[in-house]
A protein has these predicted regions:
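Mixed-charge interfacial surface used for oligomerization/domain docking
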Residues: 2-8, 13-30, 34, 67, ...
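Class I S-adenosyl-L-methionine
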Residues: 34-83
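Short, flexible active-site-proximal loops enriched in glycine and acidic residues
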Residues: 55-58, 89-93
């Protein structure tokens, strides 16, 4: 967690979400080391290390459970460590890492603006419901070109507009 952050709760995630280490540090976000390949004991040790740094609660954001076992591993880590599990809030982002990066930015902004742990957890749940990326399996599917005269916006432009719309949202 960034040293300039004086909050009482940490935001952690299971992957860097396409963000650079310096960006994650600026957001005050910690990444569970090797979370996508970790076992429950390693994740439990990571959570304990966060608590030993003086943090009282942890908001732990994870890749969509259908794509990764990291949320299941985090749940097992909480079950194996009942003394700290009540202070950890696990969130299934319902998304791939790109959208999680947007969620991390919003959660960090909420924390910096003084949001309580409970409010940040509720916000994380709300973001998980509304921030979504599309995942399309392309198993030999032939796509046709639209005969529409107006070309549609690229996925990148749509994500940029979504990011801008979410970033300008003054939720808290």
């Amino acid at each position: 967690m960034a040293s300039s952050d004086c909050s009482t709760f940490a935001i952690v995630c299971d992957n860097p979400c396409g963000l650079e280490a310096s960006q994650l540090e600026a957001l005050g976000v910690s990444v569970i080391p090797g979370a996508l390949n970790s076992d429950a004991d390693q994740v439990g040790e990571f959570y304990r290390g966060i608590f030993e740094s003086g943090v009282q609660k942890i908001l732990s954001l994870h890749v969509y459970a259908d794509f990764s076992d990291s949320l299941l591993t985090a749940k097992k880590a909480c079950q194996n460590n009942p003394d700290i599990s009540s202070s950890i809030f696990l969130v299934d982002s319902g998304n791939m890492p790109t959208a999680m990066g947007i969620m991390l930015e919003r959660l960090s902004a909420a924390r910096k603006s003084g949001a309580s742990f409970e409010a940040a957890c509720a916000y994380a749940q709300e973001l998980a419901e509304v921030v979504a990326t599309m995942y399309i399996a392309m198993n030999k599917v032939v796509l046709h070109k639209s005969k529409d005269k107006h070309p549609r916006l690229s996925l990148r432009l749509r994500l940029e507009r979504l990011h801008r719309r979410i970033s300008n949202d003054m939720y808290l």
